[in-house]
Regions:
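Transmembrane helical elements of multi-pass membrane transporters/channels
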Residues: 11-26, 195-210, 214, 223-295, ...
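Signature of the first transmembrane helix
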Residues: 4-68, 92-103, 126-128, 163, ...
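Specific pore-lining/lateral-gate transmembrane helices of multi-pass inner-membrane transport
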Residues: 73-89, 271-383
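Interfacial/gating helices of multi-pass transporter permease domains
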Residues: 32-54, 119-120, 188-192, 228-232, ...
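Transmembrane alpha-helical segments of multi-pass transport proteins
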Residues: 111, 188-191, 243, 386, ...
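Membrane-interface junctions at transmembrane-helix termini in multi-pass inner-membrane proteins
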Residues: 131-154, 214-217, 354-385
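Hydrophobic alpha-helical transmembrane segments
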Residues: 123, 152-215, 384-389, 403-424
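Interhelical loop/hinge segments that connect adjacent transmembrane helices in multipass membrane
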Residues: 1-4, 8, 177-194, 207-247, ...
Length: 466
């Protein structure tokens, strides 16, 4: 393992431990909410939360990657501060304008999304997204400066606030209100709305805590620098919109295309959303790798160091991903116990979900060359192609297969993006990936998984032993 690879691995471990801790705390909400909510109510949460990342991508405008690249090329600390102030200023301005529009058209948006009886869901979601967008660039600065401790602390505080409030609203508040304590604070008609109240409070606390960590730099837009940042980042914005749609439009299409009425569609969406949560370990690994790899690969490299390091990183990423896939897929019946009983029927699609998450990480690795070289237009080609596959296969499969069709459609989408990303890489910036060795790892993983399935699953043997 090269020195640069050791550095990346070390950064990944730092973010990994913290990300796992934060996500595991947040993940406690899944078994809790799937027990205190009906399937249709959890479907509402899954539906609205599927929209949040999409809007967040628009508001941040690809400027996180833009900040990493321009800060990496900056000649001094003063120039870095100017890059930070400009990127933060643009995102903050757009976020404020967005929230004003949400307030002005709150009722219309609520009616369009099917929540006319609960317009508060919409303005609270708008506030959550705006606050998260405003903190995105300061969080990126903490990563660029390798201040992982403060990054982790803020994320941890946010999750703890969210978690504590959800437990309070759904566990303690109904009982307190029934005894005449805080009766004004509890409204049974809010249903899943208290999830958004808790998230909004957590996002507000995060903003208040991160402001003192910005080193006295205020949002301020340098027009000349802003133009350069936008030229680099806007293709990533368009790519991010398509990429987020690839990740989350399947939930919306399950809601639209599942036959049997809106209530049944929400129930199916609730099951699908819960099963996707079971793939959290693979998602965690990809997330912690991205947190470390993005600022790492967008910094300046000498000669062919970037290509060699990227090839080595891909190999190790795939090795770890295969281990994670085997662990969760072969023990999926045990992982299913995390969910409420009504949500376990869809657990058999978990291997498909895991493969999709693994391919998503491979696409991430294949994207660094065009971000490093400034050829960000290719991001649009890749994610746009993926979106076409997503929409086409969801339309084709969901009406007959329901959420199973959505899972298969996402797998096809990620496969197509991997193929196109690799072809573009070979043509414009050939990275010497060790395909022979990677193929051997994949084949070994497939054989081990097949052996586990043929043996009747490892969890079946465990049940007999226990």
């Amino acid at each position: 393992m090269s020195n640069q690879m050791r550095k990346l691995a070390g950064q990944t471990m730092v973010y990994g431990i913290s990300t796992v801790l934060v996500r595991l705390l947040n993940y406690l909400l899944v078994p809790y909410l799937t027990r205190v909510m009906e399937r249709a109510q959890y479907g509402v949460v899954s539906h609205i939360y599927a929209v949040i990342p999409f809007v967040l991508v628009i508001l941040t405008m690809g400027l996180e990657s833009g900040y990493f690249r321009f800060a990496g090329k900056a000649s001094g600390e003063g120039e870095k501060r100017r890059v930070f102030a400009t990127a933060w200023g643009m995102v903050s301005l757009v976020s404020v304008l967005f929230f004003v529009l949400v307030l002005l058209f709150n009722g219309t948006i609520a009616e369009w999304m099917g929540y006319a009886a609960h317009p508060s869901y919409i303005w609270m979601t708008g506030a959550i997204v705006a606050l998260d967008a405003v903190t995105a660039i300061p969080f990126a600065r903490l990563r660029e400066q390798s201040r992982s401790g403060r990054y982790v602390l803020l994320r941890l505080v946010s999750v703890v606030v969210n978690l504590a409030l959800c437990f309070f609203f759904y566990g303690w508040l109904p009982s307190l209100a029934g005894r005449g304590i805080l009766p004004w604070a509890y409204d049974p008609a809010m249903g899943p709305g208290y999830v958004f109240v808790a998230n909004l409070a957590a996002s507000a606390v995060t903003l208040l805590l991160i402001l003192p960590m910005c080193g006295g730099v205020a949002p301020r837009i340098d027009r000349r620098l802003a133009r350069s940042l936008l030229v680099y980042s806007l293709p990533l914005l368009l790519s991010g919109i398509a990429g987020t749609a690839n990740e989350f439009i399947d939930r919306q299409m399950v809601l639209w295309l599942t036959p049997g009425g809106s209530e049944y569609a929400l129930e199916q969406l609730g099951v699908y959303g819960a099963v996707i949560k079971l793939g959290v370990v693979m998602t965690l690994f990809t997330s912690m790798y991205r947190l470390a790899a993005e600022p790492f690969f967008l910094a300046e490299f000498k000669g062919d160091d970037f290509r060699r390091t990227n090839a080595e990183a891909m190999k190790y990423f795939i090795i770890v991903s295969i281990f994670i896939f085997l662990f969760i897929a072969l023990f999926r019946d045990l992982f299913a116990l995390i969910l409420g009983r009504d949500f376990r029927e869809g657990v058999w699609i978990l291997p498909i979900v895991l493969l999709s998450n693994m391919l998503s990480g491979i696409v991430l690795n294949l994207s660094f060359w065009y971000k490093q070289t400034g050829a960000t237009k290719y991001a649009i080609y890749v994610t746009g192609t993926g979106l076409l596959f997503t929409v086409a296969f969801n339309i084709l499969l969901v009406p007959s297969l329901g959420y199973v069709g959505a899972a298969v459609a996402r797998l096809v989408c990620e496969s197509a993006m991997v193929a196109l990303s690799y072809l573009l890489n070979r043509r414009y910036c050939p990275v010497p990936y060790d395909l022979k060795r990677i193929g051997e790892y994949v084949l070994l993983g497939a054989l081990l998984y097949g052996a586990g399935v043929l043996c009747g699953s490892l969890t079946g043997w465990l049940r007999y032993l226990i």
